[in-house]
């Protein structure tokens, strides 16, 4: 589908963004292992999260789903059934990587695959550490590409040092460790999204988290983990599109309601504040294990900044739209230490640089990020999402301040993480 967007005279509105994608995945995957039933509201009914539900159903988990409400009938830590067919994760890297950990210690064989994009993405980052724990995984390119074959076996505890800051790798290891024969200690680069740690602790798992290590004690009691009913907060990665839209527009005020403010996810807010954005956070509260609030951003001038180091794990998915903010800012912005961008749904360094260049921005790709000159005026153009949901939405935001019309190919990609994106897009322009 092609979507045509154009310059907006002003932007106004209050938006409830869909539920957090990371938490939605975990809410169904973890509750499938619980002894009992869980009610989940605010669930993101995007294509990726629906892939997690589909895979769990193939292993005997009963799940009722209607819009943003889900009920999971847990089967217990060792109650999953061997699937009779290949588990298709669609385009969802989270589904594949978390299931790889979850299934590593289950007493059966399983095969994980996905669409062409997912099958092309490297998987050694999870396969190698899981193998070190005793897991038996194989796949194309010596396990670096899906389909992945998992022969469930005994997972060994012990010490493992994480070489990269990745919530998916960390989560895969912790899920494998739930069925382990001894405690697991993770050290190294453990600072990344911590939804897994928060949720497992809330479900009664003996997990200790310190600045330099995470220690998991496999549950010895048969009723652990407990089921966890929860409301999923709004996704800060989705909210960032509206934060940037407001920040780059001279006549804008947009509020995102009920957004998750977990410190491991608020890197984009920190960057926008450093760039000079006018941001107000109100109605702060806790919902379950997660901090939540309302975020209002008003239009104003931005300046260039540097995005690197410990910031990267806190905003890796938001870099495409932050690049739009940087293109509209005064001065240079440097993105570094973000090699992971090249292993996403697309090579997001290459796609961001090519598509924003087509709109008149000045960018230079680097091995681990990009350099954005800033200061230019964006022009409408015919651009490609490359089937990547975050690229499609970033280009739509750029189109709000570009002169003339912008035509986005494969605009339907937004449904992966934000099924109502185009409705909300029209809403803020019409307000």
From Swiss-Prot:
Enzyme class: transferase
Record keywords, A-Z: Amino-acid biosynthesis, Aromatic amino acid biosynthesis, Cytoplasm, Transferase
InterPro entries reported in the protein's UniProt record: Enolpyruvate_Tfrase_dom (IPR001986), Enolpyruvate_Tfrase_sf (IPR036968), EPSP_synthase (IPR006264), EPSP_synthase_CS (IPR023193), RNA3'P_cycl/enolpyr_Trfase_a/b (IPR013792)
Residues annotated to bind 3-phosphoshikimate: 21-22, 26, 166, 168, 192, 317, 344
Predominant localisation class: cytoplasm
Active site: 317 (proton acceptor)
One GO biological process term: chorismate biosynthetic process
Sample GO molecular function, one term: 3-phosphoshikimate 1-carboxyvinyltransferase activity
Keyword Ribosomal protein applies: no
UniProt-listed SUPFAM superfamilies: EPT/RTPC-like
Record Pfam families: EPSP_synthase (PF00275)
Cited function: Catalyzes the transfer of the enolpyruvyl moiety of phosphoenolpyruvate (PEP) to the 5-hydroxyl of shikimate-3-phosphate (S3P) to produce enolpyruvyl shikimate-3-phosphate and inorganic phosphate.
Entry-linked HAMAP family: EPSP_synth
Self-association and partners: Monomer.
Family statement drawn from the similarity comment of this UniProt entry: Belongs to the EPSP synthase family.
Annotated PANTHER family: AROM/DEHYDROQUINATE SYNTHASE, PENTAFUNCTIONAL AROM POLYPEPTIDE
Name of the molecule in the record: 3-phosphoshikimate 1-carboxyvinyltransferase
Organism of provenance: Herpetosiphon aurantiacus (strain ATCC 23779 / DSM 785 / 114-95)
Species lineage: Bacteria, Bacillati, Chloroflexota, Chloroflexia, Herpetosiphonales
């Amino acid at each position: 589908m092609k979507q045509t967007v154009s310059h907006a005279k002003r932007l106004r509105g209050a938006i409830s963004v869909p539920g957090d994608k990371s938490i939605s995945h975990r809410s169904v995957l973890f509750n499938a292992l619980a002894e009992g039933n869980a009610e989940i509201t605010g669930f993101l009914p995007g294509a990726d999260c629906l892939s997690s539900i589909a895979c769990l159903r193939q292993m005997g988990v009963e799940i009722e789903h209607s819009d943003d409400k889900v009920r999971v009938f847990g089967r217990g830590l060792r109650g999953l059934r061997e699937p009779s067919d290949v588990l298709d994760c669609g385009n969802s890297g989270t589904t594949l990587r978390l299931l790889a950990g979850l299934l590593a210690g289950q007493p059966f064989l399983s095969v994980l695959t996905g669409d062409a994009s997912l099958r092309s993405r490297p998987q050694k980052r999870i396969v190698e550490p899981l193998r070190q724990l005793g897991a038996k995984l194989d796949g194309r390119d010596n396990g670096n590409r899906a389909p992945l074959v998992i022969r469930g076996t005994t997972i060994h505890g012990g010490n493992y040092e994480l070489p990269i800051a990745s919530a998916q790798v960390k989560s895969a290891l912790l899920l494998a460790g739930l069925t382990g024969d001894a405690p697991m200690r993770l050290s190294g680069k453990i600072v990344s999204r911590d939804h897994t740690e928060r949720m497992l602790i809330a479900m009664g798992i003996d997990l200790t988290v310190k600045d330099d290590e995470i220690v998991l004690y496999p549950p010895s009691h048969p009723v652990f983990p407990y089921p966890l009913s929860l409301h999923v907060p709004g996704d800060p990665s989705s909210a960032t599109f509206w934060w940037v839209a407001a920040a780059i527009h001279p006549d804008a005020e947009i509020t995102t309601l009920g957004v998750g403010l977990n410190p491991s996810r608020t890197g984009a807010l920190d960057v926008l504040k450093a760039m000079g954005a006018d941001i107000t956070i109100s109605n702060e509260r806790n919902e379950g294990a997660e901090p939540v609030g309302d975020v209002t951003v008003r239009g104003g001038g931005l300046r260039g900044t540097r995005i690197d180091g410990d910031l990267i794990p806190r905003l890796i998915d938001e870099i495409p739209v932050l690049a739009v903010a940087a293109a509209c800012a005064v001065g240079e912005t440097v993105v570094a230490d973000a090699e992971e961008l090249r292993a996403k749904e697309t090579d997001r360094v290459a796609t961001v640089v090519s598509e924003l260049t087509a709109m008149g921005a000045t960018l230079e790709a680097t091995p681990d990020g990009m350099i954005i000159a800033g200061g230019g005026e964006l022009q409408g153009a015919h651009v490609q999402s490359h089937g990547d949901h975050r690229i499609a939405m970033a280009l739509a935001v750029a189109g709000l301040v570009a002169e003339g019309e912008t035509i986005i190919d494969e605009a339907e990609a937004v449904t992966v993480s934000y099924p109502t994106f185009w409705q909300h897009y029209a809403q803020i322009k019409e307000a």
